[in-house]
């Protein structure tokens, strides 16, 4: 039923300022802006968190000798590789992922240049194992079983062993592949770990003991950005692969 009009609202005349409706505050808009800012800050700041944490948890070069001495007395299969990685962490190496033509076997880029995969290759060479030669031989015999990510038609001795995806496949095929976990007790010195970074890029490093006071913790030696580091970041990224490899010695 339609509401009946009253004479009251028709006959009384209001004299004064015209009433103004009070504007309702748009609280939703403010929350949307805050939420967007938070998402942007999280997304772009997330890659920085491990680096900031690593700055607080990295070890000094002076502590390397103590841990290396302990590893030399160890009977662990990966002790020699872990020692080589710790010694490598003292080197001044600029990050450079460029393609270079190098010799074969035992070829290498300039000693003051390198990237993540070079840490693995150079440290294994200190134990008498040349991954450049081993990866090439395996790719030559089983090329289609390796990642087809670079539009290559054949193996390339200049770069194949310097690609993390190829090293990962080599260790899967020729080493011991362990189930990735977030339990420190599952990792031993000399283990190889492959991570997936926030950018989805693959990264690789070598597990080593921590410095005095943290020797019970699995730390890593790796080359992520501007320098080679020995630091406590094993679980800062998503672990994609965990391997042990103690291959044949080079003749």
Regions found by a protein language model. Name each.
Residues 1, 24, 30-31:
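Post-transit mature regions of eukaryotic precursor proteins
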Residues 1-12:
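N-terminal targeting leaders characterized by basic, low-complexity, disordered sequences
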Residues 10-16, 23-26, 45-170:
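N-terminal capping segments
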Residues 29-47:
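Hydrophobic membrane-insertion alpha-helices, especially the h-region
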Residues 113, 195, 225-226:
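Acidic helix/loop microenvironments that form the catalytic cleft of cell-wall polysaccharide enzymes
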Residues 132, 207, 238-241:
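A structural signal for short, hydrophobic beta-strand segments that form beta-sheets
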Residues 140-221:
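...with weaker cross-activation on analogous glycine-rich loops/strands in unrelated enzymes
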Residues 215-251:
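Low-complexity, Gly/Ser/Thr/Pro-rich intrinsically disordered linker/tail segments
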């Amino acid at each position: 039923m339609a509401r009946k009009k009253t004479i009251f609202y028709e006959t009384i005349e209001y004299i004064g300022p015209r009433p103004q409706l009070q504007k309702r505050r748009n609280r939703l808009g403010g929350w949307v802006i805050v939420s967007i800012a938070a998402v942007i800050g999280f997304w772009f700041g997330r890659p920085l968190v491990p680096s900031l944490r690593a700055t607080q948890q990295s070890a000094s070069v002076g502590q390397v000798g103590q841990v290396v001495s302990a590893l030399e007395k160890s009977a662990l299969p990966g002790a020699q590789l872990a020692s080589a990685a710790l010694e490598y962490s003292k080197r001044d190496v600029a990050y450079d992922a460029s393609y270079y033509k190098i010799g074969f076997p035992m070829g290498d880029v300039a000693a003051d240049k390198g990237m993540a995969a070079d840490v693995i290759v150079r440290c294994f060479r200190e134990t008498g194992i040349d991954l450049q030669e081993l990866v090439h031989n395996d790719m030559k015999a089983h090329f289609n079983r390796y990642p087809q990510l670079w539009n290559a038609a054949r193996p390339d001795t200049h770069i194949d062993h310097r690609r993390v995806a190829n090293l990962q496949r080599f260790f899967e095929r020729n080493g011991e592949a362990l189930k990735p976990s977030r339990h420190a007790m599952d990792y031993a010195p000399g283990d190889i770990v492959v991570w997936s970074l926030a950018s989805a890029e693959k990264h690789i490093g070598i597990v080593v003991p921590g410095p005095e006071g943290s020797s019970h913790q699995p730390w890593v030696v790796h080359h992520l950005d501007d320098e080679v580091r020995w630091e406590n970041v094993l679980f800062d990224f998503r672990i994609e692969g965990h391997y042990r490899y103690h291959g044949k010695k080079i003749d």
